Every structure is written in C-alpha cells, then in structure tokens.
C-alpha cells in the first residue's frame, strides 16, 4: 500500500509562545534530510521573529547550505570534537555564552544535552529535550521530524504554518544535461553506515527499464559512495543518464524541480525531491519509522517492508504512477 504524509501532530498542545526574543541560536547538525525537513521551521522562525538576530549552529558538511538560507543572519560551526579537545570545547563554550536570549535545539541529541548542561547560562532560555530545559518540548512520540521542528520554533514565537520558499536553493542553476525535463530520477544511495537501507540495485534497474519502455528518460544521482549501486544499474540498463558525482545541491534541486518523478531510499536527496514538489516515492526498511521520517511534500509517498528487499519493483512502479497521476 502506498502511504503519504498523515500530517497528524501528537503532543503539540499547550505550547507557550516565546517573549520578544532578540538573539536566538538554533542548533541543527544535519543530516541533509533533516536539514531539508527543517526548511519550513527555519522560515517560520524568521516569520515569527522578523527583527531577531537568528544564528544557526551546524556541522561542516552543511555550512555552505546554511550560509545560503535566507532566514538566518549568522552561521556557526560545530565540529563535534571529542571532549578531550579542550580548545574546541572552550570555543563552543564561547558560542553558547554569546548573549543569546534563547537556544532552540532542533537536534535534541546527547551532545546538545551536554551543551545545555555544561555551557548554557541560566538566563538563556533553552527549547528542547535536555534535562532541565526551561522550555521542554512536549511528547513527540509518533510525530514527523518536520512537525517536531515546527512545534519547537512555535514555542519560541515562530509560525509553524509557514511553508518555506525554495527559489534560493537552485537560484536559477541549470541541472546537468538541461535538467532532463520529465525524467525519472533514481536515488539508489544511502548512508554508508546503514547499507541495509539500500533497495537492491536490480530493483532500481527494473524501474529504469519499465520507465524507458514508456519513452521516459531515466537519470541516476548520488555521490562517489553510491558508485557501486549506480554501476550495477547502468550495467543492466545502459540507457540511463549517469549523474553520480556530478550534482551539487543547487543542481540537484534544479534537476528534481524539472523531473517527472523521483524514487529513492531513505536519504537526503529523496527528502529534497519531495520538498520541491516532485512526485517522490521513498522506499523504507525496518530501520526507518515512517511516523517520524516520512518525506514531506505535496506529492510524496512511501512503501515499507521490514526487509527492504521485499518491496517488489512492480509495487514501486504502481505507487510511482499513482503519485504522478495525483
């Protein structure tokens, strides 16, 4: 059965609006999918606090993306150094003691809880899940990650009903090969740490074959880490356009914006495709909880089996067609 985003928010009752906050530090380390799911929250925070100085604390892979976001005034780097790196810990202490009215923790990790315990002044409001936070989040069980972040910024005075504009993301960038208008884009990669999230390459090849038989172009995207999966698909269906390693984030957004459909694993580019509004199907295994991690988009859906290899290519094709026709 094809599933879409339910939109149901649990535990979001009783949140309190923030006072007039002037200096706000937002924490979001990544990964790419989480950053994409946070776009609406970032935009909503800016809408609710138009005159505030908003800073985003993120990790090195996302500094460039963060610096291009139109909603933040300052981007700060968290290298997530080990605790034995005293110089880096001292630098982080300085960041948290830079006169913030509030810290909005959208990462909610053990590391950020330690930042609250070690570095945050008592006078700084802390929105998050850390023990002792002045503004604790409600129970987020079963709540989509995008909705969690919207609720978090609403508690600090943001507007969680804002939908972020994304024209800045590609900013007129041309996707590779003329954007491949109407193409079906395959996203066969995933985190190297979780190879079990990969749908088998032969299933992607079956999708490619079926799509090309209808006259559609098919492209494959990913990074160098996805080369093996991409090569397996290319060997089976050499008519695909191989864009692995050829797309930055802007080019990827442009490609997706002009594509006919996208099908991929639980990985950042699939979230991006869903968010720009392209018909997007995410394939999930036991490692993905769709109540938390389903892609957000007007024409996004997902299929899930405990063993991702049990998702049949025919079922995926049928689901993709329903998203296209919807």
Positions of PLM-derived features:
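Catalytic machinery of carbohydrate-active enzymes
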Residues: 1-326
